[in-house]
Amino acid sequence: MTLAARPKVPEADKWQLSPQLLQPSYLGMIAGGSVFRILEEKDMTMRGLVHKYFDTIHNYMPIMSKVKLNKQIQEVEGLNSKSAFMVLILAILLLTEHPPADFDGALGSSELYQVCKYHFSLFLSLKEPSIELIQAGLCITLYEYVHGIPERAYVTIGTCARMVSVLRLHSNANSAPQSALTEDYFDENAHVISAMHLLNR
């Protein structure tokens, strides 16, 4: 996606002062604006970010299908993305960044952490649960544990568990044949549930 093709946030200044003007349909554009601003500041591309994730975090917490993630990036480039995917990209950015030297985990002073939690909370409040939102929550949970804020991690992982229940991912994962556990959606379900149990210990 070119810089000129970035989504514009409708009436951003107005809804910040009057939250009742914020429509659920705006959330993808708002999160997308944050994603592209941060990527530009870091001189990164979305594909480069995802490659970094699969070279690092994915080796220890495999919760995403590379095939599906690349397909979703193509949808973003074609201006046809699911809005929750932008929150997932923010969470991947958060998990793969080097924290600033003055970062104080107890105060949540990382700007990217605050931005990521802000969009995650908005989606939880105004949008339906989705596998992308659960994956974002798991990334945030891992970040919170690693940076010494376990109380927040406990709340975040609890939220993920409830979304898993709403989406009935347990039954979907349990019904997947072994031959299907290779880069498909059932594979994601099973790995998401595994990661959730691991982080909830």
Indicate residue ranges for each PLM-predicted region:
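Short, compositionally biased low-complexity segments
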Residues: D13-I30, M163-S171
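Intrinsically disordered, low-complexity regions enriched for glutamine and histidine
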Residues: V9, K14, S18-L21, T56, ...
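Intrinsically disordered, low-complexity transactivation/modulatory regions
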Residues: M1-P10
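Acidic/serine-rich, low-complexity amphipathic helices located in mid- to C-terminal regulatory regions
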Residues: E144-R201
